[in-house]
Amino acid sequence: MRRLPKFLSRAALAAAATLWLAGGAAAQTPLPSDITDALAKAGVPPQAVAMVVAPLPPPPGAVSRAPEPANPSGERNAAPAPQPLPPPRLAWQPDVPMNPASVTKLFTTYMALDQLGPGYFWKTRVSVQGFVKDGTLQGNLLVKGSGDPKLVVERLQDLINAIRARGIRDINGDIVLDDGIFRLPPHDAAAFDDDPLRPYNAGPDGLLVNFGALVFKFQPDAGGRTARVVTEPPVAGIEVTPEVPLAKGCGDWRGRLGADFSDPLNIRFTGRYGAACGERDWAIAYPDAGHFAERVFEGMWRASGGGLSGRVRTQRGAPPGQPWVTGLSLPLAQIIA
C-alpha cells in the first residue's frame, strides 16, 4: 500500500495541536475570500465559525539561536530564551466560545490510515493455561486485547461461540482478561463536561467492551401497567430494577424514571415510565469502568451455557498459554466509515 510521507503525518499532528492550543490567543483577522465563498456555498454564516491558522512550534530542544560566544571564565553560558512565534496567519473569532466539534478524530483517523492501512485488523487472542478434557478446561482461559475499538456485544458473542466450538464448555479455573497493551493515565470521566455517565465520556481501554456502555431497554407490556427493564449486554453481579410502573404521556422520560446509578452493583429506577414512549433505550458509561469487561464477559459466558468455577479477573501482562482462538476486528476502513 502506498503511504503518505512521514513529514505530512507529523505535520498533521502538529497542526492539530497548534489549532487546539492557539485558539483565543490572537487578534482577529479577516477571512480570505476563498473561505467566505466556501462558507456561502455551504450555507454556513461566518459568525458560526471560528478558526486559527498558526505556524508550527519548533520541536522540543530545537530552539534556533546564534552560535554561543566563548566564555573566558569557562562557565557555561545561560540558555537563551526561546524566540516568540510569528503571529497567526489567520485568526477568525479566536475568542468566541463554540460548541466542540469532532475535529481531533480527523487527525487520529488520518494517522491510523497512514500508519496501519485501511485493511488493518485488531486481534483479540484467546489462549488456555492448562488442558482440556471432556469439554472442561482444567486451568485458566486468557483473553488478551489489542485495542479493538469496536468489540461490541455481537462480536464478543462470536468470540465466545468460537471458544465453545473448539471444545471448551466449562472452565475449572478463572477467566483472565489482559488489557495491558496501552499504558494509560487515570481517566476522569467527568473532566470534559461533568457528566461522567454519557457514553462518549468512557475512557480508552486495551480490552474495550461495547464502547464501555451499558444499555437499559424499557419495554412496556401489553397490559399497560409496567415496563420491563432489560440490560444489554448481560452483566454478572449487578442488580437492576426489573420493571417500572407506567405513567401517561412521555415527555422527559429519563427524568421521570428516578434513576439511581450511585451504586454500580445495584442500579435503581424508582419512578415511572411514560406509556406513550413505546420502547426506548438509555445508554450510559458504566460507572465502575475498571470492572465492566469482567462483568460483561462473565455474564455473556454464563448466558451462553458456559460453566465457570472461578472468577473473571484482570491481569495486565499475564503470561500467554496455548493459543486457542483469535477474534478479528472489523477492518479499519469499515470501523471509521
Regions inferred by a protein language model and the residue ranges of each:
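N-terminal secretory signal peptides that target proteins for export/translocation
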Residues: 1-7
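Bacterial N-terminal signal peptides
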Residues: 10-24
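Short, low-complexity intrinsically disordered segments enriched in A/P/G/S/L with frequent Arg
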Residues: 16, 62-74, 78-83
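Conserved serine DD-peptidase/penicillin-binding transpeptidase domain
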Residues: 28-42, 98, 114-337
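Short N-terminal amphipathic alpha-helix/helix-capping patch enriched in small hydrophobics
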Residues: 31, 35, 47-49, 102-103, ...
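A short, well-structured edge-of-sheet supersecondary motif
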Residues: 39-64, 80-92
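A common structural microfeature
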Residues: 48-50, 95-97, 103, 123, ...
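Short active-site loop at a secondary-structure junction
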Residues: 91-111, 336
